[in-house]
Amino acid sequence: MSAKEVKFGVDARDRMLRGVDILANAVKVTLGPKGRNVVLDKSFGAPRITKDGVTVAKDIELEDKFENMGAQMVREVASKSADAAGDGTTTATVLAAAIVREGAKAVAAGMNPMDLKRGIDLAVEAVVADLVKNSKKVTSNEEIAQVGTISANGDAEIGKFLSDAMKKVGNEGVITVEEAKSLETELDVVEGMQFDRGYISPYFVTNADKMRVEFDDAYILINEKKLSNLNELLPLLEAVVQTGKPLVIVAEDVEGEALATLVVNRLRGGLKVAAVKAPGFGDRRKAMLQDIAILTGGQAISEDLGIKMENVTLAMLGKAKKVMIDKENTTIVNGAGKKADIEARVAQIKAQIEETTSDYDREKLQERLAKLAGGVAVIRVGGATEVEVKERKDRVDDAMHATRAAVEEGIVPGGGVALLRASEQLKGLKTKNDDQKTGVEIVRKALSWPARQIAINAGEDGSVIVGKILEKDQYNYGFDSQSGEYGNLVSKGIIDPTKVVRTAIQNAASVAALLITTEAMIAELPKKGNSGGGMPPGGGMGGMDF
């Protein structure tokens, strides 16, 4: 085990504080509509330019082990805020640095760190209660667009794309962000349920130009097993032919004489049919087939349930207004499932998302939820260069998470004003002793920093701006640093999702309180480099003359 270096008390906190400040100073310049860019060096390829706080924080690694520990703890604040709300990472970093800075002074002055922590916790509870009380529900598309615009650093186009996407796929729908191959940013919406399996044979194609199968008013057979025996299928095929409607078969696989017969019938025009492999694997496949069954009002045919293929009737098949199948994907639009059944399934999947501990499972469950609940929207971000596209994609990602958070918990005025107003509520907060009171005061001072920093980044005097905002009692009154004017921020469209502001202060205070109560730090000593000994003389190949 290698030797360790140990630092105590003031010495430990000073080194840690230096690391916190280095990281916070790099991140805070990105805050607000007039925040600056940060350029990150990459080991290969062009440098990356970003205005995303968490991206900057994740790129910082300091040489001094103790400084680095402080920086990494604050980086954790940014990461946690990004995970929980998808935005507010810079605000959280600024708050954490301010609380640590003031807290370290109080500890140095001889106050009890544990009481300071209790005071900080009391203050945060009061702030969260105030935010929730003043939060306003998001109802219109316009408000969703405003949230997206603010989070994308004032890019109204991104805000509009996001509100359009949410309008089309619903609040539960999946919105994914990809890099486009062109200059333009575009929105592509897939309505209904789509899964990543295409037709088994190209002979099923009905639209030769687009190389895809297009059926209207189709029956859908959902089967868990392989289909290779024709005799099993015959009774059902005859029943479907008499209705004159097309049939889509979703099964583990269709092969042998069953596939050959389907293809021949399709080519002769006797039966409109197409076969698709079932999506997913193992238990996930069972669940996805059940989703398709519920969406289309059919039954998943499984031997576990004691249903044999030859006994399947038309009533067991799903139905959909439109089915499109290309080489890679199958899309089912307007399934005939009952609304109540679909809602029950959605609630069940939501409960599973809450319970699961695996990120991979959570992601897959969310995909299933979106497919059932509305659809999938893809925003393809364009730009002139790769660097520009990456920078813009960062902002679209932030904005997407912010709009979701706004729909979830509502909105408060932006520009750091909600936290400023909450700081006023801390003035009369009751505490058990003076040290706890100082803890509350530390949070109260820190809450002015986001508004102050936004003003500083816009070239204004932070203290003057904060003073002027607090002179007025109106909750929504604040400073618009984009235009340099004061006014009602909500009516100007300068708003923050409550969830983003709430997670920022909770995460910042949680990590900052841990840093304040730190009394010792332990790090590995750097290894002393041994100077490598000379190489032994090489044995030449004897007796060889050149």
Swiss-Prot record:
Please indicate which superkingdom the organism of origin belongs to: Bacteria
Matches recorded under Pfam families: Cpn60_TCP1
Annotated protein name in UniProt:
Chaperonin GroEL 2
What keywords were assigned to this record?
ATP-binding, Chaperone, Cytoplasm, Isomerase, Nucleotide-binding
Q: What are the leading ranks of the lineage?
A: Bacteria, Pseudomonadati, Pseudomonadota, Alphaproteobacteria, Hyphomicrobiales
GO MF annotation, one = isomerase activity
Q: Does the keyword Kinase apply?
A: no
Q: Which reaction does it catalyse?
A: ATP + H2O + a folded polypeptide = ADP + phosphate + an unfolded polypeptide
Tell me the residue numbers annotated for binding ATP: 30-33, 51, 87-91, 415, 496
Recorded family membership? Belongs to the chaperonin (HSP60) family.
InterPro entries to which the protein is assigned, alphabetical:
Chaperonin_Cpn60_CS (IPR018370), Cpn60/GroEL (IPR001844), Cpn60/GroEL/TCP-1 (IPR002423), GroEL-like_apical_dom_sf (IPR027409), GROEL-like_equatorial_sf (IPR027413), TCP-1-like_intermed_sf (IPR027410)
HAMAP family in the record, alphabetically? CH60
**Subcellular location as annotated:** Cytoplasm
Q: What does this protein do?
A: Together with its co-chaperonin GroES, plays an essential role in assisting protein folding. The GroEL-GroES system forms a nano-cage that allows encapsulation of the non-native substrate proteins and provides a physical environment optimized to promote and accelerate protein folding.
Identify the GO cellular component terms for this protein: cytoplasm
* Entry's EC annotation: 5.6.1.7
Tell me how this protein assembles.
Forms a cylinder of 14 subunits composed of two heptameric rings stacked back-to-back. Interacts with the co-chaperonin GroES.
PANTHER family per the UniProt record, alphabetical: 60 KDA HEAT SHOCK PROTEIN, MITOCHONDRIAL (PTHR45633)
The species this protein belongs to is Rhodopseudomonas palustris (strain BisA53)
Q: What is its main location?
A: cytoplasm
- Gene Ontology BP, a term: protein refolding
Q: What class of enzyme is it?
A: isomerase
Using the UniProt annotation, give all residue ranges assigned to the region (Disordered). Answer: 527-546
